[in-house]
């Protein structure tokens, strides 16, 4: 049930052993800018879940709206490669979202920064992410924050795309509650048009291509402060992959750089087309 977006949401920080709704908090899995995530167990079903609780040290209307939007989107997007929403409720003034628990952690723990990965190892992950993104795009949703921390691994090592907290609908512009246009995302993976405040479905394709580049090379195409990366992303072509990893085929390099074109109209028509082209090109690298 939705609560009014007024009043104070500040209470003590959640801790292991506490009960929230019908869930017992076991231990913290992580925390972000606006929420804590706990491994929790349903008191009656004994089902393990990832329980996301709004960061109650904040009292911000926009964070609460974002939390509710994420819950609604996850409930609508039913796909095998998107994390499942199981429940959304309130414990007093505390909103919480129960999601399927990903025992494999995040892909960040598998493809570690600084370690180049073979194309054939990352390809199954790329295809699963692309299918999840394509499904979201077909339902008029742009994820806007594709990055390793938001790619989870389920019980059979399958990929789950998570964190739709800053997702937006196609054709709308992210704005604050005061009507100001807002730039959201993680600079390291943001497309030029997203940096300008106008994300498109092609922005998710760009972010996925940056991930592929990073995994193949062991590092991002651009580095430095967020401001420096922004300027490079808007004005400088990414370094060629083959300069860093000569074993990568010219075809694979061309596909990845096409998906990273600064003009979104020059990228692939759909994110799944990018992943499919990469799969086809990989046959020549066996």
Predicted regions and their residues:
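Conserved N-lobe ATP-binding subsite of Hanks-type protein kinase domains
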Residues: 36
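AlphaC helix of the eukaryotic protein kinase fold
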Residues: 55-76
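Activation-segment/catalytic-loop signature of the eukaryotic protein kinase fold
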Residues: 88
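Conserved short submotifs of the Hanks-type protein kinase catalytic core
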Residues: 92-106, 110
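Activation segment signature within eukaryotic-like protein kinase domains
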Residues: 125-126
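Activation segment of protein kinases
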Residues: 156, 162-196
């Amino acid at each position: 049930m939705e609560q009014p977006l007024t009043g104070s949401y500040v209470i003590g920080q959640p801790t292991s052993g506490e009960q929230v709704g019908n869930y017992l908090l076991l231990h913290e899995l992580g925390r972000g800018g606006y929420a804590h995530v706990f491994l929790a167990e349903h008191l009656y079903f004994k089902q393990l879940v990832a329980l996301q609780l709004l960061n109650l040290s904040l009292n911000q209307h926009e964070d609460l709206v974002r939390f509710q939007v994420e819950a609604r989107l996850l409930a609508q997007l039913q796909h095998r490669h998107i994390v499942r929403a199981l429940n959304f409720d309130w414990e007093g003034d505390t909103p919480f979202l129960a999601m399927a628990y990903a025992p494999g952690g995040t892909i960040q723990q598998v493809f570690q920064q600084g370690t180049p990965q073979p194309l054939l190892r990352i390809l199954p992950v790329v295809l699963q992410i692309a299918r999840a993104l394509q499904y979201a795009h077909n339902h008029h949703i742009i994820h806007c924050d594709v990055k390793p921390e938001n790619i989870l691994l389920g019980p059979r090592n399958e990929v789950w795309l998570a964190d739709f907290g800053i997702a937006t609908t196609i054709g709308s512009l992210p704005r604050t509650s005061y009507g100001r246009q807002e730039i959201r995302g993680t600079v390291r993976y943001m497309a030029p048009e997203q940096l300008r405040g106008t994300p498109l479905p092609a922005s998710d394709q760009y972010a996925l291509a940056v991930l592929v580049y990073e995994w193949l090379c062991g590092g991002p195409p651009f580095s430095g402060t967020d401001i420096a990366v922004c300027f490079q992303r808007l004005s400088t072509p990414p370094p060629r992959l083959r300069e860093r990893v000569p074993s990568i085929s010219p075809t694979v390099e061309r596909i990845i750089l096409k998906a990273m074109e600064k003009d979104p109209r020059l990228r692939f028509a759909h994110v799944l087309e990018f992943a499919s082209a990469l799969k086809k090109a990989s046959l020549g690298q066996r």
